[in-house]
Each structure stands twice: as C-alpha cells, then as structure tokens.
UniProtKB/Swiss-Prot annotation:
Superkingdom, natural source: Viruses
Protein encoded by which gene: TRX2
Annotated compartments: Virion; Host nucleus
Residue stretches spanning the membrane: none
InterPro entries: Herpes_capsid_2 (IPR002690)
Higher taxonomy: Viruses, Duplodnaviria, Heunggongvirae, Peploviricota, Herviviricetes
Protein name: Triplex capsid protein 2
Subunit structure: Interacts with TRX1 and major capisd protein/MCP.
Chain's role: Structural component of the T=16 icosahedral capsid. The capsid is composed of pentamers and hexamers of major capsid protein/MCP, which are linked together by heterotrimers called triplexes. These triplexes are formed by a single molecule of triplex protein 1/TRX1 and two copies of triplex protein 2/TRX2. Additionally, TRX1 is required for efficient transport of TRX2 to the nucleus, which is the site of capsid assembly.
An example Gene Ontology molecular-function term: structural molecule activity
Length: 296
C-alpha cells in the first residue's frame, strides 16, 4: 500500500478540517506518483481553472494517478494509492446511483461552476472527478463526439434543437445536461481520428465481411445473418475469386485488412470508452458509499 501526503499552503481551520473529514473515501487524482505533494497538485482544479473544455479535462484525467482520501492529520491529507484486486470503500461523487456489479470510471465535473464547493482556500478549491458507471461515461463521450462532428459543417441555428436533445441524458432516473462543446485542438483530434477510422472501415470492411457472412450463412441460417447478407449484397460486388482457393499472398493481404479494420474499431472505442477503475461489490443504503474492488 502506497501512501501520499498532501500539505496545504494555507493553514486549515477547524471548519476546513471538519469539511475534509466528511469527504473520507473520496477519489482524488494527482498528476504523478509522488510521496509528498502540495495542495496545488491535488485534484482537477489546476486543470479546470485554466481550461473549461470537458474533452481537454477528460484527456488529462485519463493520464492522472488515482488516490483515495483516508484521513486528515493536522495540516495535511493522507491519501492511499489503491492496489489492483484490493477492496476499498469509495464515496459516490457522481449524480447517478450505483448498483452491485457496476464498473465505475472517472469523468470530469459536468459543470465548472457548481453551486456546491467541496473546499475553497484562497484562490484554490478542491475539484474532484465524478465516479460514474462506465456505461454513462461512454454515452457522454459518444454524444459529445456526435455533436462535434455535426457542428463542423452546419450552422448552429440548423441543429439547435437536435443539440439540445443530445445534451440531455437521463440515466437511472437522473437527468443531466452535457457541457458546451469547444471545437479546440483536443476535440478536433478526436473528430479527425473518428473520421479517419470510419473511412478505413468503410473502404475495407464491406468486401471481406461479405465473404465471411456468405460462408457463415451456409452453416447458420439465423435471420440476423441473412439480413446482414442482404444489406451487404446491395452495397458490394462479391469477388468470385475469393470463394476459391486463396494463395498465401492473398491470405496475408486479407489478414492485413482484417487487422486494419479491427485496429480502426479499437481506435474509435478509445475515443468513447473509459477504463474501469472500480467494480462495485456492495452499496450502502443511501447509495453514497460502496465497497469496490480496484481493477485498473
């Protein structure tokens, strides 16, 4: 078990200490593996104070080290770096209830001007990520990517209604609104990666997939396979030579195409999916705390 000590530049008042004691078991990211840090390296405030873009903060958060607040000792916090496979009590900082078996990830705050501040000391405040189920994190990423792509070639007044609908997400009876999109360098990189990947999939996948679908339908007459075969037959012209004996070079070329398509699919997944940090084992009655296994 690795311990990190965070010392505050300002002297903590009794009120500050009381506030921090209520935040036990909260997940706090730090920039890198260090045994001793200052409050300036604690949480997301150094990032969100200079850049409000959700995608930018999310990309930085993905590179940060996870710690869990264990206790307050005088003017410092004691944080624990979780160990893979071990159980920890984790505080629910997100808006969504957790359920047993949930896989949890970290996302940036959805609002940069939350009415409820965890702790504010001078010009610094404690800003932590939301711990949410991976399913809703992926849905948020997908919608933000869709909005960004649509916004590239359309005027805002053309798509205002659609964007308003996409920005509202209801999950487990909780309604949230997505942050505004900023088409900066980070967002443009995501959109460029998505477009390149989709272009390569569109170019290479139909022919090789139709070959495999045609062979599979000979063995399996499921309606879904047949419908896929009908769909592909309208879009592709089957190369009859592929149905015969393939030479070694042709097999190698085919394998390269399959690997390329799967790699591009993985690229898109990396834009939308978040890694799992915790798996929920048990949830408290008020759903504000859970026993979780650390998986990262």
């Amino acid at each position: 078990m690795e311990t990190v000590y965070c010392t505050f530049d300002h002297k903590l008042s009794l009120s500050d200490i009381s506030t921090l004691c209520k935040l036990m078991n909260i997940v706090i990211p730090i920039p890198a593996h260090h045994h001793l840090i200052g409050s300036g390296n604690l949480g997301l405030y150094p990032i969100v104070s200079s850049n409000k873009d959700y995608v930018h903060v999310r990309n930085v958060l993905r590179t940060m080290v996870v710690t869990i607040l264990q206790k307050v000792e005088g003017n410092q916090l004691v944080l624990r770096k979780p160990v893979t496979g071990h159980q920890y009590a984790i505080k629910n900082t997100g808006p969504f209830p957790w359920e047993k078996g949930d896989t949890l990830t970290l996302i940036p705050p959805l609002s940069t001007h939350s009415e409820e501040k965890l702790l504010k000391l001078g010009d610094w405040e404690l800003t932590v990520p939301l711990v949410v189920p991976t399913a809703i994190a992926a849905e948020i990423n997908i919608r933000l990517l869709c909005i960004g792509l649509i916004a590239v070639h359309r005027e805002y007044n053309e798509m205002q209604t659609i964007i308003d609908e996409l920005c509202s997400i209801q999950y487990r009876d909780v309604l949230i609104k997505l942050p505004d999109i900023v088409n900066d360098k980070q967002s443009m990189y995501s959109m460029k990666t998505a477009c390149i990947s989709l272009s390569m999939i569109t170019a290479m996948a139909p022919d090789i997939v139709r070959t495999y679908i045609d062979r599979l339908t000979l063995e399996d007459h499921s309606m879904l396979l047949i419908k896929c075969q009908e769909l592909l037959s309208k879009r592709t012209t089957l190369n009859t030579q592929r149905c015969g004996q393939l030479h070694a070079t042709e097999i190698k070329d085919e394998l390269k195409k399959v690997k390329s398509v799967l790699t591009m699919i993985d690229q898109i997944n990396s834009l939308t999916n978040e890694k799992t940090y915790f798996v929920v084992c048990d949830v408290s009655a008020d759903n504000r705390m859970a026993t979780c296994i650390y998986k990262n």
